Amino acid sequence: MLIYDGSKAYENLQTAIKKRTFRFPAKTEKDYRDGLLLPSLEPRFTLTSDQKIFTIGSCFARNIEAELTGRGFDVPVAKFVLPKDEFRHPGPHMLNEYNAGTILQRIESVFGEFRYSDEMGVEAVEGGYLDLFLHIHQQPVSLERLLERRREIAATYQELASSSALVITLGLVESWFDSLHGCYVNKAPSKSLIQKNPGRFHFHRMDVEDVLARMNACIEIINANMKTNIVLTVSPVPIEATFSGDNVILANSYSKSVLRVAASLLYEKFDNIDYFPSYEVALSKGTAGFAGDNIHIDKMLVKEIIAYMVQNYVTGRGTDENAPPPVSHYVDREIKNALSR
């Protein structure tokens, strides 16, 4: 629980009024533009285009890295390529890490604290093998190629250790755990694999403590091994299908709420973390900000979100001092009276 002395709470309110951030902006306010809410930010650090930026997390991380690459940043994951017969999407999409468990494993592997053994996360199917640590839409390959590809991925992730900044995107709380090998996977094991191995695979729906424990471990490992800044964000892309038994709309709301709380707690704990509100910006547009499937973010909205990120972290422009003043009713009379007493 966050507790302030009463006087401090009123100081916070006064400061927020001066910054025009203490309540939702009217449509004439600077934090509202063309149907989007763009909250004023005070970044803890800045980024420069000569820096190496490593991106890790859910599919929205792919949107971020594509836009950053187009703006001249060195983004190692964006360079990862795969043959089209293995994966019909751009190569970086194969590297999606959907939950805090797989993100932790991947970061641990960079610093020698986790090893992807040849037996882990391999499912035999018609036509070859699938890697449960990777994207759900992969094509079967030979076991030899699967293991070779893992080495290629490991080489890409070694770039993380020499990166100036990280962008970590939290995606889901629904995850699958392999109790035989003690690891989380990204691709759900098939029903037949589960039936052949009773008691091996378990569905986990993480809560705030679960996510926080794993992400705390991630940041502590990173900070113990390198000096870097971290932009933490929550993906606005909803869950496509839920194993929870809940309506997917409710399951998604739970998922994003848990991740958003965890992100705030991480921001409060670590000085080298900044929270970037891509989730809040995207949702302020409503379903108009999504493609026809109501899952993928509209490409133009992605560009607006990244432009907003660049404005705050790269150009250093931050808040606009020439923004229009608040509308006359922006500060309620009751609040004015309370502040004057």
Spans of features found by a protein language model:
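Extracellular glycan-modifying ectodomains
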Residues: 1-341
